[in-house]
Design a protein with these regions (language model features):
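Extended, helix-rich architectural segments
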Residues: 1-209
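C-terminal anchoring/interaction modules
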Residues: 1-47, 51-56, 308-534
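Charged, low-complexity surface segments at secondary-structure and domain boundaries
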Residues: 7, 94-111, 119-126, 265-285, ...
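Structured, contiguous alpha/beta core segments that scaffold functional sites
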Residues: 14, 151-324
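Short, mixed-charge, low-aromatic patches
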Residues: 68-80, 89-95, 104-107, 242-251, ...
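Short, hydrophobic/amphipathic alpha-helical patches that form generic packing surfaces
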Residues: 73-84, 284-293, 299, 460, ...
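Generic hydrophobic, helix-prone segments enriched in Leu/Val/Ile
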Residues: 78-83, 130-141, 220, 262, ...
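Long, contiguous amphipathic alpha-helices that act as assembly "spine/axial" helices in icosahedral shell
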Residues: 106-153, 275-310, 343-376, 385-419
Length: 534
């Protein structure tokens, strides 16, 4: 017997909703508790300045256990290298282009319009705090998971970015293993609640506590979760609840692509896991080993400087009264040897070999040791810079695809969503068909250099076998120029359209005929341009 299952609508009772959300929050907390020991080790050895996952006082010194700073410096360089390769400052690291549903004869006009939109979007990004905040998220990405909050701003700053530390974040995944529940723990003073959430409705007990202690901090939980009942478009529910008072203070619905303000991205992940795994987790054994080796070296150095001594227990020398300082007179019994230095056992010469290997492994895991160390005396050439970026692109190819899908595209979709909401731009929906996002960052261009190299080899082989004239006839020069411009990120307005190419070719033909009538031979450059009309 076949039974039709009728989907049930979610219960609207506020109290029941709060209990359900708190149950999901505690389940997400249980998932995170399994990861906290790994996260805390990464923070302790490589990010000691970051907030701990355990309750600690503000500005507590956490660097006492760090003896080797290779990982501390390396993770900062990793974040800077990642930022310069994917979202470099004051550069267009992506662009909007026409999708597959736009007719080819209209794509150039649409791309020129989208190029103007791209310029405005990146002007907004460059005048915002995006660069500062995304660097903070890249530090968390080294551990495995980063979070960037993108909110609507004011008239001066239309968009505000905020890096959410991993200790404040709890995640849960849905049926497709995509993150569909985001919990942010936030401590805020009572008097600041209505400033942060102007339309919040506070329960009576919270209002009474606010009147008594307005500067007292309370814990709130911001929740964003996916509403799967809406199958036509993306829909998210945003709400703020208090675990202490078991009440919902504020709720809001977000609809459309780019409406989710929380952007979660991961370096890599294993199947079935919610949180990502970053390069710091891979390098953690080497980090601990090098830290221990340096600690032992320092202990051995202290032992070599201060020395160890043995003394005969003759009842004359009282070791508690001896101070090893210049000018000290130490009595000794007749016939005894007094204080005798003890030679330490062990050979610390092997420590240099172990330490060198461990440091090299750490730098390699954090992608800081590529093609050797640049020569400080000689500045890097453009070819060397391009080759180093290509080497980085080859090493992080898999992670780059995930960062493109979970960070770059969502950031631009979110920015476009906010700017459209504010009426600053007019653009169709960015859904991959009408309009698509194409990355033009240094890492993306380094990956596309393979296509350019393939074209160069193809044309070189044709010229070697058939000669340059027949090659010009076989290869479409104008299409080749468009292909190279697309791969190298050249703006669309710099390339002539087919109509403009025809007009230019006609003018060149008239010039050639005029030169032939005067008996002069046309120049090689004119011959090359004339081949465009063939």
């Amino acid at each position: 017997m076949v039974v039709d299952v009728i989907p049930q609508a979610p219960v609207d009772f506020s109290e029941s909703k709060v209990k359900q959300l708190l149950a999901k929050y505690r389940r997400a907390q249980a998932i995170k508790d399994q990861w906290i020991p790994i996260f805390e080790d990464c923070y302790e050895y490589a990010l000691p300045q970051r907030e701990s996952f355990y309750s600690e006082s503000i500005a507590k010194r956490r660097s006492e256990r760090i003896f080797d700073e290779t990982a501390v410096v390396g993770v900062q360089e990793f974040a800077s290298r990642l930022q310069s390769g994917i979202v470099p400052n004051y550069a267009r690291w992506a662009e909007f282009t026409s999708g597959t549903e736009i007719p080819k004869d209209e794509q150039k006009e649409v791309n020129e319009m989208l190029d103007t939109v791209t310029e405005y979007v990146f002007e907004i990004l460059q005048n915002s705090n995006f660069s500062q905040e995304v660097h903070e998220t890249f530090l968390d990405c080294a551990v495995g998971t980063g979070c960037l909050l993108v909110e609507e701003g004011d008239a001066v700053h239309p968009i505000k970015f905020k890096a959410i530390p991993l200790p404040h974040l709890l995640l849960d995944a849905g049926h497709d293993e995509k993150i569909d529940h985001i919990f942010r723990e936030r401590r805020i003073k009572f008097r600041q609640i209505l400033n942060a959430y102007p339309n919040a409705k506070l329960p009576v007990r919270m209002m009474e506590e606010m009147g008594k202690n307005p500067d007292k901090e309370c814990k709130l939980i911001e929740i964003v979760y996916r509403n799967y009942n809406n199958t036509k478009e993306e829909e998210y529910q945003f709400c703020v609840i208090s675990e202490t008072y078991e009440a919902e203070l504020f709720s809001q619905t977000f609809k459309g692509m780019g409406s989710n303000p929380y952007l979660i991205y991961r370096w890599s992940k294993c199947a079935g896991e919610v949180y990502g795994r970053g390069p710091l987790q891979l390098a953690l054994p080497a980090i601990k080993t090098s830290n221990l080796v340096i600690e032992l070296i320092l202990e051995n150095a202290q032992m070599a400087i201060s020395g160890m001594y043995q003394v005969e227990d003759d009842g004359v020398i009282n070791v508690d009264n001896i101070q090893l300082i210049p000018g000290t007179i130490i009595p000794k019994a007749v016939g005894s040897s007094g204080l005798t230095p003890v030679q330490p056992a062990g050979n610390f010469q092997v420590s240099d070999l172990v330490l060198r290997d461990m440091r090299q492994n750490i730098k390699k895991a954090l992608y800081n040791d590529m093609l050797g160390t640049p020569n400080e005396k000689t500045p890097m050439s453009a070819t060397e810079v391009a080759e180093r970026m290509a080497d980085l692109s080859r090493q992080i190819g898999a992670a780059f695809g995930r960062l493109q899908a979970e960070l770059v595209n969502p950031v631009l979709q979110r920015v476009v969503y906010i700017l459209k909401k504010q009426g600053r731009i007019q653009i169709p929906t960015v859904n991959g068909r009408e309009i698509k996002i194409r990355s033009s960052s240094p890492l993306a261009q380094a990956q596309q250099q393979q296509d350019v190299a393939t074209l160069d080899r193809f044309i070189g082989m044709l010229q070697a076998r058939l000669g340059p004239q027949l090659t010009n006839i076989l290869v479409k020069q104008n299409e080749t120029a468009k292909f190279l411009a697309k791969k190298l990120g050249v703006p669309e307005e710099l390339i002539r359209s087919d109509k403009e190419m025809g007009q230019a070719a006609g003018q060149i033909g008239e010039m050639v005929q005029g030169l032939q009538q005067t008996g002069m031979q046309p120049r090689d450059s004119i011959n090359a341009l004339q081949n465009i009309t063939k």
